[in-house]
Amino acid sequence: MLAFCRSSLKSKKYFIILLALAAIAGLGTHAAWSSNGLPRIDNKTLARLAQQHPVVVLFRHAERCDRSTNQCLSDKTGITVKGTQDARELGNAFSADIPDFNLYSSNTVRTIQSATWFSAGKKLTVDKRFLQCGNEIYSAIKDLQRKAPDKNIVIFTHNHCLTYIAKDKRDATFKPDYLDGLVMHVEKGKVYLDGEFVNH
């Protein structure tokens, strides 16, 4: 595990911080590392990270209406009623530890609805850059961070974006379920993947 961290994290200071947080997480009931090799970051660990620097959390949208037998909220391209409940539950837990953040989503009905139910009234900014994912997603994240360098950022996006980031940054195979997330941060103009967000 130590060798993996040393090869993945270029900042000595951040390496020490993440090791300490992983050790703290390991004392709990959940493993500190996911089976895909990504560190597991729960709400409390995320709050500690946010004390060190602003965090960027990317979530996959909630349950899609067009791929479920559950009742749709409204538009068939949006999310289900169950999806709204799951997003609200996640948002309540998240906001209890990270109350201050800027909120973004891609320009699809399902991500907009997910972000709206997650935030319970927080201002949402729709940004089409979070629909198509490749290296350009890092430029978009850095752009948001430059505009508000001291703010945490939450982005609702899509499974292919999260899969791309995990593979590109840590060579990890990540197949996110609805509302699964990744935790990142920007340091000295570079975007780093810290781990997988787990809502426990």
Swiss-Prot record:
It is found in: Periplasm. Keywords: Hydrolase, Periplasm, Signal. Residues 1-25 form the signal peptide. One of its GO terms (molecular function) is phosphatase activity. It comes from the Bacteria. Pathway: Bacterial outer membrane biogenesis; lipopolysaccharide metabolism. InterPro entries: His_Pase_superF_clade-1, His_PPase_superfam, LipoPS_heptP_Pase. One of its GO terms (cellular component) is periplasmic space. Its EC number is 3.1.3.-. One of its GO terms (biological process) is lipopolysaccharide metabolic process. The keyword Hydrolase applies. Belongs to the phosphoglycerate mutase family. Ais subfamily. Catalyzes the dephosphorylation of heptose(II) of the outer membrane lipopolysaccharide core. This is Lipopolysaccharide core heptose(II)-phosphate phosphatase. It comes from Escherichia coli O6:K15:H31 (strain 536 / UPEC). The gene is ais.
